[in-house]
Amino acid sequence: MSAVLCPRCGRPVRRTRPRAGGVVEIRCPRCRYLMFDYPRPCAGMVVLKRGHVLLLRRGHRPRRGSLDLPGGFVEPDEAIEAAARRELREETGLEVGRARSLGVHWDRYHLRGFGDFPTMNFYFLARWRSGEPRPADDAAGAMWTPLGALGRLRPRFAWAHMGRVLSDARRLARARA
């Protein structure tokens, strides 16, 4: 992993310890230039199929082996929903129909050698149409999980916000049924 360099003087920068409120600064030790730790946008898709939700098992760090939803980082100039669809396709080979927004959830992502940085996670809900998921990209496995089993799986979720996302999806699915 390469170092993050100061845009002003080109030296490696350092992250400070979190201040009150969890704020982390990224400051150059040489020229004192301050870079802001802006959140990185991420997009994910909650896919429902006959009372089940699609969960993935992470194949890579961070949190390898834990349960996750299809999703990832938004690319430059990419629409949020398009990013969620792209990640779903890359990680499972699946396509879905109409998607509905589930909202935005904040979290942190750990990058080895650099530390934690904030993420802004946009989720969408869609119904499965056809095909079976084929784990690819950074997914080591894929499983259709009964909505009723999600509570006991919560300790295995990759991210703290996943429980809230799946609760919202479950509530919305029941309201639409």
Where in this protein do the model-derived segments appear?
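Nudix hydrolase/Nudix homology domain
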Residues: 1-2, 117, 132-177
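Acidic, metal-coordinating catalytic segment for phosphate/diphosphate chemistry
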Residues: 2-45
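Nucleotide phosphate-binding site architecture
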Residues: 7, 14, 54, 75, ...
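Conserved beta-strand segments that form the floor/walls of ligand-binding pockets within enzyme
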Residues: 8, 27, 54-55, 68, ...
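A generic structural micro-feature
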Residues: 37-39, 66, 114-120, 139
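Active-site segment of metal-dependent pyrophosphate-handling enzymes
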Residues: 48, 52, 93-132
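Conserved Nudix-box catalytic region and its N-terminal flanking loop in Nudix hydrolases
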Residues: 48-90
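A short Gly-Trp-Pro
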Residues: 49, 70-76, 125, 163-164, ...
